[in-house]
Regions:
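Phenylalanine-focused residue identity feature
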Residues: 32, 36-38, 85, 91, ...
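C-terminal helical cap and adjacent loop that interface with cofactors, partners, or active-site loops
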Residues: 112-178
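Acidic-enriched, low-complexity/disordered segments with a strong bias for Aspartate over Glutamate
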Residues: 14-16, 53, 89, 99, ...
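Generic detector of short, locally flexible boundary/turn motifs and exposed helical patches
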Residues: 80-86, 92-97, 107-112, 117-120, ...
Length: 178
């Protein structure tokens, strides 16, 4: 992005969590990412600069059509991004063409990367990786920690943390009730 690296803007808390869980210093890091897909040459044929100006046929074919994506996401918006529109009709916002959410992801002036991987090696030889991607059916965080004695995984959507100690029955913790 123009103001800061996307990985910091979108994943600083994820990186903090990794460092906290590892409880040691990162000794080596590698990272790769780029604006791979959301470029004009990958736009659906006949697409317009704003989703509201696309034909019904293009809207139907386009996986990233704002009219498909935003109404459902508006219901879950809590902070940032779409939350600033709470109480407003998303269809009116898209038709106004005043906000970047109405702009076609392929034709926008966005320079933020759409995918990135970060690999970290820690001082004892253990490692961790982080994948940030725009290419997911659901837009929420998924955390999966693999250890020598078990694994822990969960996501930011349902508030459930699955704890699997190898050889034992899975324990599910509902963080909303704990």
């Amino acid at each position: 992005g123009k103001s800061m690296p996307t990985i910091i803007a979108k994943c600083c808390h994820d990186l903090d969590l990794i460092v906290w869980l590892m409880n040691k210093k990162c000794s080596t890091i590698s990272s790769f990412g780029k604006l791979f897909w959301f470029r004009p040459e990958n736009a659906p044929e006949g697409s317009a600069e704003h989703c509201c100006d696309c034909s019904e046929e293009v809207k139907e074919k386009c996986l990233y059509n704002a009219y498909k994506i935003y109404p459902e996401r508006m219901k879950r918006a809590v902070v940032g991004g779409l939350a600033r529109f709470k109480g407003r009709d998303i269809y009116e916002i898209l038709a106004e063409k005043k906000d970047k959410v109405s702009k076609c992801v392929y034709h926008s002036d966005n320079d933020a990367i759409d995918n990135q991987v970060v690999n970290m090696e820690f001082e004892d030889g253990s490692n961790a990786n982080l994948t940030m991607t725009a290419f997911s059916q659901e837009c929420y965080r998924v955390t999966h920690v693999h250890g020598t004695k078990g694994e822990v995984f969960g996501n930011s959507e349902d508030g459930l943390v699955h704890v699997n100690i190898y050889g034992e029955e899975e324990k599910i913790v509902d963080v909303n009730k704990e």
